[in-house]
Amino acid sequence: MLKRRRTARTVALLVVLASVVVLALPTVKRIVRDLTLPLAYTSLIRQQARIEHLDPALIAAVIFAETKFDARTSPTGALGLMQIEPATAEFLAHRSGGVAFEVSDLAEPGINIRYGAYYLRYLLDQYGGNETLALAAYNGGQTNVADWLAQAHAARVRFTIAAIRFPQTRAYVARVERAQHSYASEYPRLVSGFTTSSSG
């Protein structure tokens, strides 16, 4: 009799524990997702994606690769969520119709995301919509991409991630591409109403 009561209590306890796990699982998954794949400024990202005809998951992925949504200044002087260098930001400000530009503007998320999205669109346009080339230029610079393209052309091979000579830039492009897919699948409301291509 005592053994049956213990068994019944054990079964009841296991049922309660299983119920708690089942009920808590979505919350735990969401917490893990938010820690490993953070997302903030969704409305700003979506707004700039719409203006620049970009995949919002691409913008989020660049922010993730650059700062994981924790804006800071890099050792090279790049600033803000999308790590834009002041000289690049000044070029972008003038090109996009800005009249006054201050380096401190880059600390403001709305301005930083606007310039970063504008720069991504500019690079995509420069490289015929090729995201690999645009991301390589975003991280490694357009001069280096021109050199890598020339080397691939001289060798009569198609340009791929493997042709990127800087290991950091090669890893960056791969990280952004992975994160872009993750943002699209983990945050469906981020990309809702958008096509998945940023080619223009």
Language-model segments: which ranges?
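Hydrophobic membrane-insertion alpha-helices, especially the h-region
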Residues: 9-26
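Catalytic glycan-binding domains that act on GlcNAc-containing polysaccharides
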Residues: 24-200
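N-terminal Lys/Arg-rich, disordered targeting/topogenic segments
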Residues: 1-6
